[in-house]
Amino acid sequence: MLLSKLVDLIKSGESKFIKANIFENIDIENAASLDIALKNQISFLEENNILKDNLGKTSASAIITSNNNEILGLLESLNISNIVVENPRIAFAEVLN
């Protein structure tokens, strides 16, 4: 499913969509944990997640996250598309369904 379609799905869900920063409208083929995500996969990152320190090592093409300037700055510098919501865990669950 195209990333823009996933954004539309999340907008209609319960995770309280804030914004999306799409650098490339890629086809998302699957979802995975941030530490094992591959290209064309989406993952999520909560604000206080220990995996935040390893963000530069992920191969995920898109990440669902909260409105945290530090995380958003890192994602932008890594050119990783992101979907910003109030509750990344709920949005990730919505994507899995």
Roles of regions detected by a PLM:
Residues M1-N97:
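Terminal amphipathic alpha-helical/low-complexity segments used for targeting or macromolecular assembly
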